Design a protein with these regions (language model features):
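Conserved short aromatic-hydrophobic micro-motifs
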Residues: 39, 46-47, 84
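Enriched for short, Lys/Arg-rich terminal
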Residues: 72-113
């Protein structure tokens, strides 16, 4: 199984390091980078074994049809959501991560039923 991100997700994660540092969620830029690196590593390593749900319409309208999402808790207050598409090519299963966000931004669009 192969997990990869589209360029827009890579750019978002790079920008996230700066945002986390500048908004003082982390005192050091290196610590913010480590947090983002660990988040991405968690997604790449564990996405294939996570429970998946169909993505709400809000996300499929913006990031593509046929999306699913999986939840990646980071601490008591923050959960990250990876929105992805799955496809097979040459018998190999691929996971294309098309968007990443967290509950602080997207909670109103996620159905927790």
């Amino acid at each position: 199984m192969n997990v990869y991100t589209i360029p827009e997700v890579k750019q978002y994660l790079n920008d996230l390091i700066t945002i986390l540092y500048e908004k003082e969620y982390f005192s050091f830029e290196d610590t913010a980078k480590k947090y983002v690196d660990e988040l991405l590593d968690d997604i790449i390593t564990n996405l294939p074994i996570k429970s998946k749900r169909p993505a709400p319409k809000y996300f499929t309208d913006r990031y593509g049809k046929g999306l699913y999402y999986a939840v990646f808790p980071k601490n008591k207050r923050t959960q990250w959501y990876a929105f992805f598409r799955m496809y097979k090519e040459s018998g190999e299963l691929y996971y294309q991560v098309r968007h990443i966000t967290n509950n602080h931004v997207a909670a109103q669009f996620i159905n927790y039923d």
